[in-house]
A protein has these predicted regions:
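Conserved Rossmann-fold NAD(P)-dependent oxidoreductase catalytic core, especially the SDR/UDP-sugar
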Residues: 88-136
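Mid/C-terminal beta-alpha module of Rossmann-like enzyme folds, strongest
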Residues: 208-273, 291, 296, 304-324
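Conserved catalytic-site region of short-chain dehydrogenase/reductase
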Residues: 75, 111-121, 166-175
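NAD(P)H-binding glycine-rich loop region in Rossmannoid oxidoreductase-like domains
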Residues: 35-39, 43-88, 96
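Conserved beta-loop-beta element that borders a ligand/cofactor-binding pocket
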Residues: 146-169
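N-terminal Rossmann NAD(P)H-binding glycine-rich loop of SDR-like oxidoreductase domains
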Residues: 3-23
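Substrate-positioning beta->alpha
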Residues: 143, 174-176, 193-213, 220
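A conserved pocket-lining segment of Rossmann-fold NAD(P)-dependent short-chain dehydrogenase/reductase
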Residues: 128-132, 180-200, 204, 216
Length: 324
């Protein structure tokens, strides 16, 4: 079976590709020219753009399964690039897959595609899409997911996966969440805010994707969650792994909003970590996201949070992203 993977150079992609190779799939990967991660000599590399319909027809031609990971993540309120990549790019992939006879389209959506409220009810696959969000990233992921499920009845069998906050090893870029872990380890975040995320290990995401490929179920959607942990929990686990002391102070959200620009100047990396969008996401993150359906139908069993953090820090050390 040949599998074509967009977003192959991202955090999930660099964990998924080895899993596919180990399971004897032929892999064609959409590669960014500026990627500096593993070479994957067994993989057919394809240079193209999800915004170029013609190149995506060539990319999907001959593939049995397409895994659409490519997306623009943004923690800014407005992001024209997120709208373009996450909506138009997904539309191009769907059209190309239909035209070239792809037999299974696995779409990576996000927890952000779904309405967060009501917070006091379990969040699962029945939660409404966040199509009216005033945040471009959230709305773009909701619209992309809507398009995929709509095509499901039109000749293209689909599966939708909705991971929560993804962390773990093989984070070459590193991701926004990987950078948060690095900065906490190095003591560059002087205070914390209340709130947290549902954290999930990227390796568990890769295994769930493999299970979705092998499953005969189609037209299904799966929440891929892990454990909800506060930022203070995260900082404590990082400290136990040899990182900096846990920041003493927890500041109110209005103060964090006002001081975000100061915090960002203290961080490593070019993109801002603290924005009104990212802080609000921490504040209202859902604490009860059910992965029961994925457990039942895909055999999904997320590993413990503390082990994921330990493995992530160990990987960052081995790759000289933090001092050993």
């Amino acid at each position: 079976m040949k599998i074509a993977v967009t977003g192959a150079t991202g955090h999930i992609g660099t964990n998924l590709i080895p899993t596919l190779i180990q399971n004897h799939f032929e892999v064609r990967a959409l590669i960014h020219q500026d990627f500096h991660g593993p070479e994957f000599p067994q993989v057919e590399k394809f240079k193209g753009d999800v915004l170029d319909p013609e190149s995506m027809e060539k990319f999907t031609d001959g593939a049995d399964t397409v895994i659409h990971l490519a997306a623009k993540i943004s923690i800014e309120k407005k992001s024209p690039e997120a709208l373009q990549v996450n909506i138009e790019g997904t539309r191009n992939m769907l059209r190309a897959s239909l035209k070239t006879g792809v037999r299974h389209f696995i779409h990576f959506s996000s927890i952000h595609s779904l309405k967060s409220k009501p917070l006091n009810e379990v969040l699962d696959e029945t939660r409404s899409l966040n199509l009216d969000s005033d945040t471009d990233y959230d709305r773009s992921k909701a619209e992309g997911e809507r398009m995929v499920m709509e095509v499901s009845g039109s000749g293209l069998p689909v599966t939708v996966l909705n991971p929560t906050a993804v962390i773990g090893p093989n984070d070459y870029i590193p991701s926004l969440l990987g950078r948060a872990i690095i900065n906490l380890y190095q003591g560059k975040i002087p205070s914390l805010v209340n709130g947290g995320y549902d954290w999930v290990d990227v390796r568990d995401i890769a295994e769930a994707t493999l299970a979705a490929i092998k499953s005969e179920r189609r037209g299904e959607k799966y929440m891929l969650s892990g454990e909800w942990k506060s930022m203070r929990d995260l900082a404590g686990t990082i400290h136990r792994c040899g990182g900096a002391a846990v920041p003493r102070f927890t500041i109110p959200f209005p103060v964090a909003m006002a001081g975000a620009s100061i915090l960002n100047r203290m961080m490593t990396g070019r993109e801002r970590l603290f924005t009104p969008v990212s802080l609000e996401s921490l504040r209202i993150s859902h604490r009860n996201i059910s992965h029961n359906k994925a457990a039942r139908e895909l055999g999904y069993r997320p590993r413990p949070f503390d082990g994921t953090i330990a493995d992530t820090i160990d990987w960052f050390k081995k790759n000289k992203l933090i001092a050993a």
